[in-house]
Amino acid sequence: MTDKTENSGLSSDATEVRAQKLKLLREQIGDVYPAHFHRTMTNAELAEKYQDLAPDTETQDLVTVAGRVYSSRNSGMFMDIHDASGKIQVFSHKDTTPEEARGLLPMIDLGDVIGVTGLVRRTKRGELTINAQQITMLTKSLLPMPEKYHGLADIETRYRKRYLDIMVNEESKLRFQQRSRIVSSLRRFLEDEGFMEVETPMLQPIYGGATAEPFKTHHNTLKLDMYLRIAPELYLKRVLVSGLTDKVFEINRNFRNEGVSTRHNPEFTMMECYWAYADYEDVMGLVERMFETLALAVHGTTEFEFGDKQLSFKGPFPRVSMPAAVKDATGIDFLAIKSDEEARQAARDAGVEIEKDATWGEVLAFLFEEKVEATLIQPAHVIHFPKDISPFAKEVPGEPRLVERFETYCNGWEIGNAFSELNDPVEQRARMVEQMEQAHARGEKEKTLDEDFLDAMDQGMPPAGGLGIGVDRLIMLLTNSPSIRDIILFPARRHKSD
């Protein structure tokens, strides 16, 4: 019952031993990979049903379970098998287990998937156990299983072979179970708030809704270059124009052909929603309710640990304008600065290198990123962004250089981005033309106007608040995961030979 064997008829190589056992099993029992196996309950259901069974107690209850063999003792007399819900001990002995079933034990290796039928008992030591009466080979594993209690030492192997990571690392398994719970809770929260879920194109003839480098592909039949979407925004706004619903959301993948880091993966999950007849103030309240709901779903409380920090998702969150935050950090009063050159010089005087053609708003945003962002540990809304980096947001009344936009930060990370959405079609066209010209100046010659979206805006979009949430980063916070690779099942990796 190990990856080494004393049987002189078998190879000493663990992989070869398994291959030889597979051959013997095929000869002895036929189908080693049956199409179906009926179990009467999961391991967790078994544990719950018999939680009050006293030690050293036997029952006449016959059950059938299945799972992967994780450990074996006394030549297979005791085995621990795991399904997705938990562990159960299996006991095989000549007094309780027929010879035919015991005859299978030498053929079972760690990592094999087996089915067991037997009687439930609890041992003197209090271990819930099944006295095996029948053992069925369901899947013969041809590769040795990583050691359960040492896990995978190589972090790259954990990412490249996630199935092994989850198989031997309970923390990884729990993390991805929590991810599923968070996404389900997010969807349920939005539905309870009255939002309708829709699906918009992942393949788009014109990319838009954000400033990012897209992945490009080609549709052979349509003879059309297309792009994996960088954002669903322009399609979700079309939904608002249509009148299908006043509250719309989508949870799905976005793709950006850009850098990879502990917070960035080229394929990532976003939630975007749009709320007609609301503004960014309303959306701030929505974010606070959302964060509180998700923290309660995962932790049962709004207080939880991330690394060495104690975070609180209990609203309301503090609010600070971007110009005020930068002034507090640097002493530079951007609202008193009148020109782009004056803004650039102020940055240089503060010891910050800036692009020679950076605008007033770009300088303000850059200084915020450099001097403020990392200090925002507890959740906070940063409001009033520069208009020249926010082409889809309404102006702040009385301050035409700023817009009604906020980003929600936590642990120094941007988690959410929201606007009072621009719905003036004339102004929208002007800003998108300017955005396109800036893209062309950066060498993005393929960037074009989305005339269909602008036609939709001409039909009239109601006033609305819009929100995008980086679901992966939010999950990182809620699961105490320092890297985005820890919460994406199969993150993008460089080819192993590179």
Swiss-Prot record:
Enzyme Commission code(s) on record: 6.1.1.6
UniProt keyword list: Aminoacyl-tRNA synthetase, ATP-binding, Cytoplasm, Ligase, Magnesium, Metal-binding, Nucleotide-binding, Protein biosynthesis
Cofactor annotation remark: Binds 3 Mg(2+) ions per subunit.
Class of the enzyme per the UniProt entry, highest EC level: ligase
Names of required cofactors: Mg(2+)
Protein name: Lysine--tRNA ligase
One of the Pfam families matching this protein, by short name: tRNA-synt_2
Positions annotated to bind Mg(2+) 1: E407, E414
Quaternary data: Homodimer.
Superkingdom, taxonomy of origin: Bacteria
UniProt organism field: Sinorhizobium medicae (strain WSM419)
Cellular component, GO, one term: cytosol
Reactions accelerated catalytically: tRNA(Lys) + L-lysine + ATP = L-lysyl-tRNA(Lys) + AMP + diphosphate
InterPro entries reported for this sequence: Aa-tRNA-synt_II, aa-tRNA-synth_II, aa-tRNA-synth_II/BPL/LPL, Lys-tRNA-ligase_II, Lys-tRNA-ligase_II_N, Lys-tRNA-synth_II_C, NA-bd_OB-fold, NA-bd_OB_tRNA
Positions with a binding annotation for Mg(2+) 2: E414
Family: Belongs to the class-II aminoacyl-tRNA synthetase family.
GO biological process: lysyl-tRNA aminoacylation
Subcellular localization: Cytoplasm
GO molecular function: ATP binding; lysine-tRNA ligase activity; magnesium ion binding; tRNA binding
